[in-house]
Each structure stands twice: as structure tokens, then as C-alpha cells.
Amino acid sequence: EKKRPDDNDDNDDEDRPERPERPEEPERPERPERPERPEEPEREEPEREPKCDDEMREKVKRRCDNENRRFDARRCECGEKKRPDDNDDNDDEDRPERPERPERPERPERPERPEEPEREEPEREPKCDEEMREKFKRRCDNENRRFDARRCECGEKKRPDDNDDEDRPERPERPERPERPEEPEREEPEREPKCDDEMREKVKRRCDNENRRFDARRCECGEKKRPDDNDDEDR
């Protein structure tokens, strides 16, 4: 352990407290024996390809020629039998041939596109300055036609209620809407006149002259008076 401040540097064993004796550890129980692993079957090692040097290559190639078989250089062995069109002196004949590609069916000819009609270019609107505007406006007035300021040209004929100086652009004609069934005319509620004291006295005198009752709510004369009505009744 580290020295304490009261330890002497030259006396290492002095004043060290005695360590208490460790109690005896109980005996550990014995571990159960592990079951033996079953023996694994031996793995068959893949056969290693023989080393194919030039000497081995020539030897195997001659044997393949004698057997009329193709020489497989990658495996350094004889492969399938030669075909009649194989070359005997071709060193690369041991490559496996690619299967012939099936011939592609001919594509059907595309139908010719119908010639598109030439697009008519929209007529450009003439430049409508003040001078041009006045010129067309005078001509339209002479022809009794309305002046279309947007197109800077004369439009439809004027109607009797058109103003001579009207030069607003014509609105495009809207498609006619289907006629709606005629609705019965709604009777507008009569507006009650303003019935102040002056109006009240005026209408009341007129009702008395006509021998009719005065309707104060509507500020007008109502039905004729009956004999039992009071002269001063103003309901």
C-alpha cells in the first residue's frame, strides 16, 4: 500500500499493521464432466485440379486429338466430341461454344403518320395607337357600327340605345343558357312610409275627409268607418 505521512523513508517494515489471516476458503465442488462431442464425419476435400503446365497441356491435347474430343484447357482434360466443322489446328477450340442466338423477328413497319394540316397562324392584331384608334372610330361611326377597341376594328351594328362615343370592347358571345321556368312574381312587401307627427296629422285629416279609418301602423287610410266608430279613433 502507499506510504502514510508518518512513515520513515529508510524503514520500510516499521509500524506496518499485521494483516489478519484470511479464512480458509471452502472447497469448490467439482465441475461435472462435459459430455463428449460426437465425432464429426470427415469432410471430403474437393479434388484439386491438376497443375496444367505446357508439358501437361501438350500431353492431354494429343490424347484428346486421338479420341477426337475437344481439349478443355481450363480443366486440363478432354471434353465433348468434336464436330465436323471444328478446326484441328485451332488452339482455342477448347472453349465452350456459345449457343446460337435465335434470329430476331423482323419488326413490323410503322404506319406512316398522316400529314398534319398546316396550322393557320393567328392574325396579329394591328397596333392600335391614338391615330389608328381615331381613324377606325370615325369609319365605324359612318357605318353605324360599334368600335371594338381591343381588336381596333368595327364590330356589330349599333343598337338604338348605344351611345355614339361608346368604344368599349365587345364581350364574346356567351352560349345561350337553357330557359328557366318562369317563376311567379314575388310580391315585394310594401315599405312602410316614414310616419312622423307631421305626416301622421296630414294623413289623419285626409282619412277624416274621406270618412275612412286611419291605419297608424301603415300611416295610411284604411277601410271606411262604420257608424259605431269614434271620430277620434286613429288605430
UniProtKB/Swiss-Prot annotation:
GO terms for cellular component: extracellular region. Its main location: secreted. The keyword Repeat applies. Residues 1-133, 155-201 are annotated as: Disordered. Signal peptide: none annotated. It is found in: Secreted. Coiled coil: none annotated. Keywords: Repeat, Secreted. Residues 16-85, 95-133, 168-201 have a biased composition (Basic and acidic residues). It comes from the Eukaryota. Used by the larvae to construct a supramolecular structure, the larval tube. This is Balbiani ring protein 6. The gene is BR6.
